[in-house]
């Protein structure tokens, strides 16, 4: 039984989906990345489900990124539909389901592999159901795209678990790459909808309208890339490289049209542009990997995971957390520092090999910089996300 004071403190935390999932997802990413650094440097013994490499890849995507996506979509759907999303006990149960997945994958409770997979796999389908139910109620077909994307994320998760259970690294990689591309697709769609508006509002400039052909090519090429990696369809190397580079160029032109140069005095906006830059950089580097073979795929993939996904997430959760708790849309110096630290994490992780840096040292530095960036967010926003809206 909790005291009235405790109840008042806990209640706001489960009042809207972004509160528990943004805070818990961010804190989890700090713990997960530090655990990964510890394993790399043999600082301590850690034997999660499958193996540490599988756990790191899986948990930064299906533990961290999936939590943030859930918090964002289940909050945004209320604005889209005018209907109430999960809150209170139902939201707490969904959060506990997510937490259960993290625990059974990190620690050995003596459970069978199939049961562990089932616990983890059950989270995203519930999210898709809740989201889809609200969208269908008001027939808001424009936003229905997010439901099949989450369904495909579930398939990617199945592939990773199937690969772990059957000891098939190809399935693991397929699921891993698929999830990266699906989250990138979400950023592509949402970014196109809101980044020009955020740029205009934040800088006091005119909103840039999208060019229909450019928007179609950018989104369609990203959808195609996501489907290819999810299905595991093998294309000729030149075609796959060409598609990635073409899409990367489309993304870059799109970003330039949003006028990143007007954002330099507004951290809450330039951080979004900096995060989006990770998409063209990541796609083009991946294309060069397939063309030349001189770039490691696991390395250039972090152009997307840190540069695009991590950076965009940090910028978006900062903005949403401020706006939805009644604060001014001003990031402040500490969060601006966090944005910069995460950018350095991307640079160190992706380009270490060209500077001749030691592998373990570079990986550790990238992990620590990530931990600092999301640690700053977690500490700064903990009181805001656990107390009532102003």
Regions found by a protein language model. Give the residues of each.
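Hydrophobic alpha-helical transmembrane segments of multi-pass integral membrane proteins
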Residues: 1-390
